[in-house]
Amino acid sequence: MPGADRRVAWYQMSVVHSLDGKVVAVTGASGIAAAAARRFAAEGARILVLSLDEAECATLASDLDSLGAGHHAIPVDLTDGPATEAAFASGRALLGRPDGLFAVAGGSGRRFGDGPLHDATTEGWRATMDLNGLPAFHAARAAVRLMLEEPARGSIVLVASVLAQAPSPRLFPTHAYAAAKGGALSLVKAAASFYAPSGIRFNCIAPGLVDTPMAARAAADPDVIDFARRKQPLAGGMLDPAEIAAAALFLLSDESRMITGQILTVDGGWSVTEAE
């Protein structure tokens, strides 16, 4: 077999069912979270879905059941620490100890008045920070507590945003949201360093503008769509949630077993392209 063919064959074999036998918790049940849960299930994982929206949980659970048995969805308010711990405990009893966590749950703070710093209110800032920071914190804490059980192992992937690294002052001047997502970047670095000796990895994905329900306002704005075409040239517009799911699959799989404390920016070129 020619060398190139051997490399292709090895790659194809290595990624088939790359989550076989693993239990992966996903926070959120729409958009990126839903795409990821479906992809992980297709790759052989048993999925624990945790989300506030009961209807979305039920819909996603039904979709996952069509891909095979062994999945479970639990409606839970992830801003509530004890409720999150209880949900993870239930998931462990049903599916086993989690091998991975993909923490997606969060949202825009615009409804709380998020915008430029000089217009921000203390209440709006706190609400936006809680909406994005608490679900990631509570889920990561609950997951890592279970992953520390002997033999310790696991992979935790948080979702941040390109806005934490490459701002868009004209169209997305949402400073509380950027600060909250910046916190995810810092948490990943600190936690990765602390838990590496235990074999538990922490990484972060920073997506660009993705076509999700959270981005519905942006998707309906011709100015934003034109901006996205220029700012994300690899995508030619908004990113597909499946692109983020693919990156998460890599970080949760053993293919990335030597990677921790890293920020994987999946932005279609946003952070290296001028479009303002």
Where are these regions (language model features)?
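Canonical Rossmann dinucleotide-binding motif of NAD(H)/NADP(H)-dependent dehydrogenases/reductases
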Residues: 17-48
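Short, small/polar-rich loop/turn modules that mediate ligand/substrate recognition or access, typified
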Residues: 196, 201, 259-261
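The beta1-alpha1 cofactor-binding region of Rossmann-like NAD(H)/NADP(H)-dependent oxidoreductases
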Residues: 75-86, 122, 242
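Substrate-binding pocket helix/loop in short-chain dehydrogenase/reductase
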Residues: 112-117, 121-126, 228
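Short C-terminal tail/terminal secondary-structure segment
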Residues: 7-14, 260-276
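Catalytic loop of short-chain dehydrogenase/reductase
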Residues: 107-108, 157-183, 188-197, 209-210
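A conserved structural motif in NAD(P)-dependent oxidoreductases
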Residues: 232-244
